[in-house]
Amino acid sequence: MCQSNQIVSHFLSHRNVTNELAEKISKDHYSYKPAETSMSAEELVKHILTSFHLFANVIKEGNASPFQNKQEETETDLNVLAKTYTEKTVAILEQLTEEQLDREIDLTSAFGRKVTGRALLQLAMEHEIHHKGNLFVYVREMGHTELPFYQQRM
């Protein structure tokens, strides 16, 4: 399996579970927060979906400019967003080159350090996994008991 296929496969092994959890959130639970200081379920899902896409764009561009170009999302259906952002992120990941993954990106303004594309990809994956764990808690507290394993077999 080539590098880009491995990256996409690993991404989807986690994203498909994130999307499955998002499917369990009915619109009347979009505003659910487990604590006053928590993101709402809707905010959390949008954060997960858009963050990986943003990180992938930073790797593709080789600089922090995508952080400056955050677009407000007008779509309100989490399932539509999950499908759209997953497809857009996969399209970027499929095109990443070894050069882009090995290139050092100056992210001192965002993270206080320079990182390689590969290191940022790892950070993006860990960010997804971290927040997916949060999402499991939200969905359980909404009353769902039939939940997927944290990672899908690919």
UniProtKB/Swiss-Prot annotation:
Key words of the record: Metal-binding, Phosphoprotein
Recorded superkingdom: Bacteria
GO molecular function terms listed in the Swiss-Prot or TrEMBL record: metal ion binding
Disulfide bonding pattern of the chain: none
Phosphotyrosine modification, residue list: 150
Binding residue positions for a divalent metal cation: 47, 127, 131
Classification via Pfam families: DinB
Similarity comment: family membership: Belongs to the DinB family.
Subunit field text: Homodimer.
Protein's recorded name: Uncharacterized protein YjoA
Source species of the chain: Bacillus subtilis (strain 168)
Organism taxonomic ancestry: Bacteria, Bacillati, Bacillota, Bacilli, Bacillales
